[in-house]
Amino acid sequence: MALAASGSALSLTACGVIDGIGGGDSSEAPKKGDDITVGLLLPDKDTARFEKFDYPLIKKEVGTLTDGKGKVEYANAEASPDRQSQQFQKMIEDQVDVILVDALDAKGIASDVQKAKDAGIPVIAYDRLAQGPIDAYVSHDNELVGEVQGRALVEELGSKAASSKVVMMNGDPADPNTGLVKEGALEELEGEVNIVKRYDTDKWSPEVAKANMKKAIASVGLNNIAAVYSASDGLADGVIDAFKEAGASKIPPVTGQDANLDAVQRVVSGEQFMTVYKSFLLEATNAAKMAVYKVQGRDIEFDALTQSSVDSPTDEGIPAQLVPVVALTKSNIEETVIQDDVYTVKQICTPEYAADCAAIGLN
């Protein structure tokens, strides 16, 4: 798949093309009016995007699509699969009309998905592919995320890539996205660089990443590590802290994912080489549309949003919407997160980063 241009270009798809499709209610699907309840289950509060972007964007879009009559019943699992299961079951008991779930434990949540199906409640997997009889899936192309990270790292290392010692800091093995991202990264890295250490990171914990990076530094040598493949911005934060505490005079290229504000600031300052920008706006608004369209039986519009399909360990041919991604570096901050109104220059260029911003013409 070709690399996407920018989130601003992608938003045309959400705001223009889909909105232009006429209502196509299916006579076979149960239809409801605008007075609907969308259950939203998000995984944690450590990842900044969920509370700051995903929940507010989904809530706003549901309101827009239902003339203010629809509502979102929201719960955050705070990194506890057991808590998420309890929250899921409560939403079934509350008889919400549809559930959007970003599963902490994709396999473990399958029984809850089945209970929802038995209760006649559609379930849409959000951001991570849950197992069980889900009705649809909306996320980014996670394999492409890894490819973008790996390709950017190889290009940055240039002619020294083949002899470069690289540490891989992968995500939580319980997260189905982790395997896809890792697979994409390895397609670009294997045979191009020397991967000397590989770590999985329980619950995507920055502290675990930091501890593992300290082990890698002790084993490989501070000055012998040419780059670090980090699967997310949170992990990159821990990796960079480990280098700082080890007394590194210069931090080698470190990748990331999510375009968190602190990560964008690290990119500006040069502490972090790149991050993967994924349009929260497009993912969240399309998820809200899919949920509302599913409940209201608007099959033509629903199908227009789910023209891809994916397989899970339990189901095949799941209707899916895969949102493209883009590599964010110093060179395209203005054309991505600023142009898409994710952050303002003022938010990025605080006094601490003012000089770095000026150096790259960000003002």
Language-model segments: what does each one mean?
Residues L12-N363:
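A residue-level marker of the well-folded mature domains of exported/periplasmic proteins
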